[in-house]
C-alpha cells in the first residue's frame, strides 16, 4: 500500500510511471538509502563522484565502505551544475557511482531537464550509476523534476526521495528509493539484513500525506517565502 502510494505520487506530480511491486523500496528515511546503495554497489577501491559543495554523508558513507571519494566542483558561474567537460578529462575507469542532488543542498540550485539528460548520457557512456537525491523537489520550486522523466533513465539511475522535507515529517523517518527492478532487488538484499520493516501506523500516515495536493505545497512555500524574505532583510541590515 505504501509502495503504491509512492507510485501514485510520482505519477501525479512527475508524470513518471513506477511499478509499485518491484521499482520502489520504502526506507526509514532516505538517509539510510545512501548507506544501502553504497553497500550494494561499491567495493573496496571503487571511486565515487561526490559534489563539492554537497551533503557530507555521501563522503562519509563512501569512506565507510572503503571506496574513494572523488570530488567534482560546483560553481556559481555554471549555475551549480557539474562541469561535464572537466569530468570527461578525469580518469573515470574506477568510478562506479555519482551522487547528484537537485534542488541542490546547500545552494538551492534547481535542475533542468537538459541537465538530467546530460547526467543520464554521462552515466550510460561511462557505465556509472547515477543516484539523484531528490528530497527538496517541492521546496520553493515551481518546477519539480524527477530523473526518471528522462527516457531510458531507469537503465542507469536511482532516485531517493523523502517525506521529511516535502511533508514536514522528519521524525517519522519515511523515504524511498526507486529504480529498475534489478537495482532495487540488489538494495533490498542489503536492507533486509538491516531491519524488519516499518511500523504500520507510520506507513498509514505516509500514505495519507502522499495524497495531498498542490494546495499543501503552495501553503508551505508561502510560509517558506516569508521566512526567506526575512532572512534576506536581516542579512542586508547586517551588511552580509
Outline where the language-model segments fall:
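N-terminal small-domain helix-loop-helix segment of the aminotransferase-like
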Residues: 1-29, 36, 210-212, 230
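Short acidic capping loops at alpha-helix termini that bridge into adjacent secondary structure
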Residues: 17-24, 44-47, 94, 154-157
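A short helix-loop-beta submotif of the ANL/AMP-binding
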Residues: 63-70
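Active-site phosphate-binding strand-loop segment of PLP-dependent enzymes
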Residues: 70, 74-142
Amino acid at each position: 500500500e505504501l509502495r503504491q502510494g509512492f507510485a501514485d505520487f510520482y505519477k501525479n506530480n512527475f508524470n513518471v510511471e513506477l511499478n509499485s511491486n518491484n521499482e520502489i523500496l520504502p526506507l526509514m528515511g532516505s538517509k539510510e538509502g545512501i548507506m544501502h546503495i553504497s553497500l550494494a554497489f561499491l567495493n573496496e577501491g571503487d571511486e565515487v563522484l561526490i559534489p563539492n559543495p554537497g551533503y557530507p554523508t555521501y563522503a562519509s558513507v563512501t569512506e565507510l565502505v572503503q571506496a574513494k571519494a572523488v570530488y567534482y566542483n560546483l560553481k556559481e558561474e555554471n549555475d551549480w551544475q557539474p562541469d561535464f567537460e572537466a569530468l570527461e578529462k578525469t580518469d573515470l575507469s574506477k568510478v562506479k557511482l555519482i551522487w547528484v542532488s537537485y534542488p541542490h543542498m546547500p545552494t538551492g540550485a534547481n535542475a533542468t531537464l537538459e541537465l538530467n539528460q546530460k547526467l543520464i548520457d554521462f552515466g550510460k557512456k561511462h557505465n556509472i550509476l547515477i543516484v539523484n537525491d531528490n528530497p527538496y523537489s517541492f521546496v520553493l520550486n515551481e518546477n519539480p523534476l524527477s530523473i526518471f522523466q528522462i527516457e531510458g533513465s531507469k537503465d542507469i539511475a536511482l532516485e531517493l526521495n523523502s517525506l521529511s522535507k516535502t511533508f514536514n515529517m522528519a521524525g517519522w523517518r519515511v523515504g524511498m528509493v526507486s529504480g529498475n527492478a534489478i537495482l532495487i532487488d540488489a538494495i533490498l538484499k542489503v536492507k533486509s539484513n538491516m531491519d524488519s520493516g516499518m511500523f504500520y501506523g507510520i506507513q498509514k500516515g505516509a500514505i495519507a500525506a502522499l495524497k495531498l495536493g498542490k494546495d499543501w505545497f503552495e501553503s508551505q512555500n508561502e510560509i517558506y517565502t516569508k521566512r526567506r524574505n526575512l532572512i534576506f532583510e536581516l542579512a542586508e541590515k547586517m551588511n552580509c
